[in-house]
Swiss-Prot record:
MF terms in GO: chromatin binding; DNA replication origin binding
Modified residues (Phosphothreonine): T24, T151, T154, T157, T160, T167, T170, T181, T258
Binding partners and assembly: ORC is composed of six subunits. Interacts with Mcm10. Interacts with CG9890. Interaction between the TREX-2/AMEX complex and the ORC complex is required for ORC localization to mRNPs, and consequently mRNA export.
Protein's recorded name: Origin recognition complex subunit 2
Biased composition (Basic residues): 49-59, 183-193
Gene name linked to the record: Orc2
Main subcellular location of this protein, as a coarse class: nucleus
Function: Component of the origin recognition complex (ORC) that binds origins of replication. DNA-binding is ATP-dependent, however specific DNA sequences that define origins of replication have not been identified so far. ORC is required to assemble the pre-replication complex necessary to initiate DNA replication. As part of the ORC complex, might also have a role in mRNA export.
Length: 618
């Protein structure tokens, strides 16, 4: 294949050259400017050497050929430049052909080609971008963009994706968006409401039968109702539907059925029957009468209603126990007696002895007193005695042992005086034996504080016993440190004969000593006006002691007596004082037949007379 055909250039024919010359001669005057431009173009062409050009053809496009194209009407021809996409991947044969073409083009470049002249002399101008497509297009602000890209920038922190919370629609918008409930659904709901109202009206009829349908009837009724509902649904589905565009599914809330009164009663009965649990005392509750009857079978109607205290104790002493039991008790007591030297050593070291355990410790402490302390100064205190007071105990120490006279009225001042007296005679020691440190008259805070202060004196040694299981609750940390006890378990299994001699008992005539002691302690804590009011009630009750129909002192009589004695100024003040008496059970109040309020003191007349005599002496 020749180089001319490959390169796309054709050798100009002779006829073409002649036509070009004639055209130039006839239009010489009008085309002077074009001829000058042709000369300049020819002169400006560089001389081509045999050296291969260092510039490589465009990698993407190359001139293929100049083709002539007419518009179909014989008018002027125009040059159309066709581009052929070139592949970057060429074979070795194609490279050899391109070398041959470049050599041939360099040989023919020295003379102008006919096509070049034709292009210059043509009436149409060819755009430079069509011919010189290898020029690099300029970009505006390219250097500024390059400098900006070369500048290091801090990378942007990726934004945290926001959870899109949709703004709730307004009520008006919702009403506009949501379509209306279909007509057949509204009709069905209306029928159901009317049916419920009719059922509720029937429940209030006169015949309220307790008829309960069986399982078969209920199942049949439910199946029939389901069938009715399905038929209604089928009828609704058979209605012709108007075609419309797709809508959202409409959820129609099903109205809950209102339970009728009869159904509620039936469910309540069923629930009550299911929750019934038989109780052991249910029979007595069902057969008991509302009125509570008090029996008159009292101890006074017995042949021997109540015995004297001496008689009771003599009868109890005649009871004989078995020899084995007595032998065991004696063995236990002998073991405890062997502890006496240890207890004496502990007392001399500054500690105090506390005995606890089941059984009376009175006999054991008395044995220690007789056998060990017969040569020492000893003060025995019976804590179970109902009339015992701390003042009596302090007076015994100051007057009988120290010969210091009557102790001060304040118990703490009396303890201070005792401590000062013992400091003057350090060789004198006092052994204080307290039976039942937790007795009824020693359980108050004041008595325990005085005893703890006495136990802290170096010259006084305390030996006590307790019987109540909760006795340690009486003492706080300070009292325990003052007592400085050494605890000993002395379970004797002996009866509490002496400890219970003064307790209230229905079998003993002299019961009430404890109540009398309680009344003394409460009475001593009252104010002057309260004591005067209480003494008026005591005197009135003793005055009517022999009256069999005595029911109590009327409230109006008490109020008038208090007004005359200037003890109260109003009815409310008197009732406030009586409230305190009622709380401490010093007075009982009851209503008589006529509705008046009667006040009585629940203590035997002999004890009440003894109390009055004691108060008059003071």
């Amino acid at each position: 294949m020749s180089a001319s055909n490959k390169g796309g250039y054709k050798t100009p024919r002779k006829e073409n050259l002649m036509s070009i010359e004639n055209l130039t001669n006839s239009e010489e005057e009008s085309e002077d400017l074009n001829t000058a431009m042709v000369g300049n173009a020819v002169e400006s062409q560089p001389k081509v050497t045999s050296r291969r050009s260092t510039r490589r053809p465009s990698p993407t496009k190359k001139y293929q050929a100049y083709q002539k194209e007419s518009n179909g009407k014989g008018q002027e021809e125009r040059i159309v430049v066709n581009y052929v996409e070139m592949s970057d991947e060429r074979s070795s044969d194609a490279e050899d052909q391109e070398e041959e073409e470049s050599i041939e083009e360099s040989e023919n470049a020295a003379r102008p080609a006919a096509k070049d002249l034709h292009l210059i002399q043509s009436e149409y101008n060819v755009a430079g971008t069509s011919m010189f497509g290898f020029n690099t297009p300029k970009k505006r602000d390219a250097m500024a963009l390059a400098a900006l890209n070369a500048t290091p920038c801090t990378p942007k922190t990726p934004k945290t994706p926001r959870l899109g919370v949709k703004t709730p629609d307004t009520k008006r918008k919702k009403s506009m968006d949501q379509p209306k409930t279909p007509a057949h659904v509204r009709t069905r709901v209306k029928k159901q409401i009317a049916k419920i109202v009719a059922d509720s009206d029937e429940d209030f009829s006169g015949d309220e039968s307790d008829f309960r349908p069986s399982d078969e009837e209920s199942s049949s009724s439910s199946s029939s109702s389901d069938a009715g509902n399905s038929s209604d649904n089928d009828a609704a589905d058979d209605e012709p539907k108007t075609p419309s565009r797709a809508r959202r599914a409409i959820v129609v809330p099903v109205l809950p059925k209102t339970p009728s009164a009869a159904r509620l009663r039936q469910s309540a009965r069923a629930k009550k029957s299911n929750e019934f649990v038989p109780e052991s005392d249910g029979y007595f509750h069902s057969h008991a009468s509302s009125k509570i009857l008090t029996s008159d079978h009292t101890l006074d109607r017995l042949k021997n209603p109540r015995l004297a205290a001496d008689r009771v104790f003599s009868l109890l002493s005649e009871i004989k126990t078995s020899a084995e039991h007595e032998g065991s008790i004696n063995a236990i007591m002998e073991e405890y007696r062997s502890y006496f030297p240890k207890w004496m050593c502990i007392l001399n070291e500054g500690f105090n002895i506390l005995l606890y355990g089941l059984g009376s410790k009175h006999q054991l402490l008395q044995s220690f007193h007789r056998e060990v302390l017969h040569k020492q100064t000893v003060l025995v205190v019976n804590g179970f005695f109902p009339s015992l007071t701390i003042k009596d105990m302090l007076d015994s120490i100051t007057s009988d042992i120290l010969d210091a006279g009557i102790s001060p009225a304040n118990p703490h001042e009396a303890v201070d005086m005792i401590e000062e007296e013992f400091a003057l005679i350090p060789e004198t020691h006092l052994f204080l034996i307290v039976h039942n440190l937790d007795g009824a008259m020693l359980r108050n805070v004041k008595a325990q504080a005085i005893l703890s202060r006495l136990a802290r004196i170096p010259n006084i040694h305390l030996l006590a016993s307790i019987d109540h299981i909760n006795t340690p609750l009486l003492w706080d940390q300070g009292k325990l440190c003052s007592f400085n006890f050494s605890w000993w378990d002395c379970t004797t299994m002996l009866p509490y004969t002496n400890e219970t001699a003064f307790e209230n008992s229905l079998l003993v005539q002299n019961s009430g000593e404890l109540a009398l002691s309680s009344m003394r302690s409460v009475f001593s804590s009252l104010t002057t006006n309260s004591r005067g009011i209480y003494m008026l009630i005591v005197k009135y009750q003793l005055k009517n002691k022999g009256n069999a129909t005595y029911q109590g002192m009327p409230f109006r009589d008490l109020y008038s007596s208090c007004r005359e004695a200037f003890l109260v100024s109003s009815d409310l003040a008197l009732r406030a004082q009586l409230t305190e008496f009622l709380d401490h059970k010093l007075v009982k109040s009851k209503r008589s037949v006529d509705g008046s309020e009667q006040l009585t003191i629940p203590i035997d007349g002999a004890l009440l007379q003894q109390f009055l005599e004691e108060q008059e002496k003071k």
